[in-house]
């Protein structure tokens, strides 16, 4: 755009495997009609709340008719970093650490980071790894972790008010020209694991409940 910002187009592609939607999958595996629109709606809803809370994001504005979002320019960390915040021991966390935890046990807004790399299965990386590899500074990591926990609480509290429980959620962060950490990408049902009365809610059902 002329003002230096970027325009993101929301598509109907989702992560999954063998034609089945799975937010934990690394590869884009299927197309669901209308999912781009609903992902944009949810992203607008949460980005506006997060911005209002004084947390930096790349969100500027959106156009639902065009399914586009105007965003501030941001660089990704390394070749892309995913940040997961977990309230419950489920999914890959449980598979890795099942010797040390019960399925579904509470976690204190546990934050972990993975490199975006489908071929390597999005490998986990520690704070020391990120700093020593020159991906980010220790201060940037501390900001990223605090922001992740604050944003996750905003999302979880909102879902709680709708009778829904957030178990975990995945974000992407980047940084601006001054090196400030900012939330980028989207906040959509496909990036979170949500339960209602102990039952997993698939993302398309969650969209329906969220915008009911």
Language-model segments: residues:
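Short histidine-centered catalytic/ligand-binding loop motif
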Residues: 23-38, 120-147
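Phosphate-binding core of ATP-grasp and ATP-grasp-like enzymes
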Residues: 107-121, 152-163, 189-192
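A long amphipathic alpha-helix within ATP-dependent nucleotide-binding catalytic cores
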Residues: 136-167
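A short glycine-rich, hydrophobically flanked beta-strand micro-motif that places a catalytic Asp/Glu
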Residues: 58-65, 160-175
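Coil-to-beta-strand transition motifs
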Residues: 5, 78-80, 163-166, 178-181
């Amino acid at each position: 755009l002329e003002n230096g910002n970027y325009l993101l187009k929301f598509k109907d592609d989702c992560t999954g495997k063998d034609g089945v939607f799975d937010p934990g999958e690394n590869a884009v595996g299927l197309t669901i009609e209308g999912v781009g629109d609903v992902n944009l709606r949810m992203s607008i809803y949460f980005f506006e709340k997060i911005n209002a809370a004084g947390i930096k994001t790349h969100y500027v504005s959106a156009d639902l008719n065009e399914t586009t979002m105007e965003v501030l320019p941001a660089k990704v960390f390394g070749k892309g970093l995913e940040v997961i915040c977990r309230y419950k021991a489920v999914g890959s966390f449980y598979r890795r650490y099942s010797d040390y935890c019960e399925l579904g046990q509470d976690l204190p807004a546990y934050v972990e980071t993975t490199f975006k790399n489908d071929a390597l299965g999005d490998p986990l990386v520690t704070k020391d790894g990120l700093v020593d590899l020159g991906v980010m500074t220790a201060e940037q990591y501390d900001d990223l972790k605090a922001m992740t926990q604050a944003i996750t609480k905003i999302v979880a509290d909102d879902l709680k008010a709708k009778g829904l429980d957030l178990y975990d959620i995945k974000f992407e962060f980047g940084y601006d020209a001054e090196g400030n950490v900012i939330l980028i990408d989207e906040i959509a049902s496909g990036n979170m694991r949500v339960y209602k009365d102990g039952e997993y809610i698939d993302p398309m059902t969650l969209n329906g409940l969220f915008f009911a």
